[in-house]
Amino acid sequence: MTQTSNIILIGPMGAGKSTIGRQLAAALHLPFRDSDKEIEKRTGVDIPTIFEFEGEEGFRNRESAMLEELCTEQGIVLATGGGAVMRPQNRALLRDCGLVVYLKTSVKTQLRRTARDRNRPLLQTENPRARLEELMRIRDPLYREIAELTVDTDRDSIRKVVQEISRYYRMNNKDSIPQDDSNTEPQGDG
């Protein structure tokens, strides 16, 4: 981990990066950023619209630029898109940006968590399971390559995942955050 106090959440769609990221940020009293949401704010359109008009390459260009911008901030929890690790320059950037945490989940869990979400352009296919398996085969080694910490989100509650990351972060970043533990319990146990 670098001297910055950022926490970067990586992993496949449906791993819980946004949900866990918000609760982790609240527990650590840090601002939360979601790179996909920041892209949507900046462009004024949703991710599927960007894919429709610019293709995946256009979206990945926007994503790389947004990650560069967000990594200039210090003391944030950042949820990245599932494909952010596809470009070598993004992997290098994220590794240098802070503590990289791989939120690992199974394809079965991904399917359950994303079944009704039409905001996932890569899953708009006849066989979402096959697509998720293909993405996992390609991306899992890339997530592992840059992760300092890997947490399985299949077996633990949101609360336990947040506690595990918080504990690791505090042990390795003692001077960067307040040590007041009075309000570090996340809400819900999802």
From Swiss-Prot:
Q: Which PROSITE patterns match?
A: SHIKIMATE_KINASE
Question: InterPro entries, alphabetically?
Answer: P-loop_NTPase (IPR027417), Shikimate/glucono_kinase (IPR031322), Shikimate_kinase/TSH1 (IPR000623), Shikimate_kinase_CS (IPR023000)
A GO-annotated cellular component: cytosol
Q: What GO biological process, any one, is recorded here?
A: chorismate biosynthetic process
Provide the E.C. number(s) assigned to this enzyme. Answer: 2.7.1.71
* Highest taxon in the source lineage: Bacteria
Q: Which residues bind ATP?
A: 14-19, 120
Task: List the pathway annotation.
Answer: Metabolic intermediate biosynthesis; chorismate biosynthesis; chorismate from D-erythrose 4-phosphate and phosphoenolpyruvate: step 5/7
Q: Does the keyword Cell membrane apply?
A: no
Localized where? Cytoplasm
Q: Which Gene3D superfamilies match?
A: P-loop containing nucleotide triphosphate hydrolases
Q: Give the multimer and partner information.
A: Monomer.
Q: Which family does it belong to?
A: Belongs to the shikimate kinase family.
For this entry, the protein name equals: Shikimate kinase
Name of the coding gene: aroK
